[in-house]
Amino acid sequence: MMNNSNLVFKAIGFDADDTLWNNETFFQETQSKFRKILQEYPLDEIDQKLLNIEKHNLQVYGYGIKGFILSLIETSIEISDQQINGKQIGNILDLGKKCFSNQFIYLKMLKQLCGIFIKNTFYY
């Protein structure tokens, strides 16, 4: 068993999205708009196909907006049996561009939390 009393941390990192600001809302809004682009296909099939493709693509693209948008495009191609048109793909790309321009809303108590860490940090 390890003795934790000798542990010294040089840095603490935060995975910022959904930890320091609300990011998930943007993904949900984008997915809702994506469903409208593919409204001629069954909603439950779209959602399930997207979820499966996103999970598979995590190994390739990782997390984030770019991987999400590429997964939306791949989903649209598969769900439409390659019948999706260029205008619809363009609309999906526009959704992605909008994701990058969203203003983040910092989660409550962020300033207080950062202040606590700064106040209790020891510099060597």
Where are the regions that the model predicts?
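Substrate-recognition element of Asp-dependent hydrolases with the DxDx(T/V) motif
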Residues: 86-95, 99-102, 110-124
